[in-house]
Amino acid sequence: MRRSAFIMFTWCGLMFAGAASAASFPCVKAQLRSEKTICQTRSLNDADVKMATTYAIVLHALPMGGRDAEKGMQYQWLKQRNTCGSNTGCLSRSYASRQQHLDDIIQNRVLSHGPF
């Protein structure tokens, strides 16, 4: 129970800290159509911050062996996300899918078993 409360407290803290900034990447350096669309669309911007925060929590909570695999999945997801270009529906679905995957890791691998 303590671990669950700690993770949720950390997640909330990071979420509010990230909410004050724009996307999880510097929008002034956005070059891809997908990045520009994320920066210009509030709901996508919010989804990006939430996903990036959850991803950071997952990486810290996973055992070392699982981190590299998750980093690889994130890289593949970014490649897939970028194929959406400026299609907001595609980007929204991509973020929803990735967020669900990360939420499942927190529920099934971290909270139920712990990081060790």
Report the location of each language-model feature:
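Positively charged n-region of N-terminal signal peptides that target proteins for export
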Residues: M1-A5
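Bacterial N-terminal signal peptides
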Residues: I7-F16
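N-terminal alpha-helical modules
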Residues: A20-F116
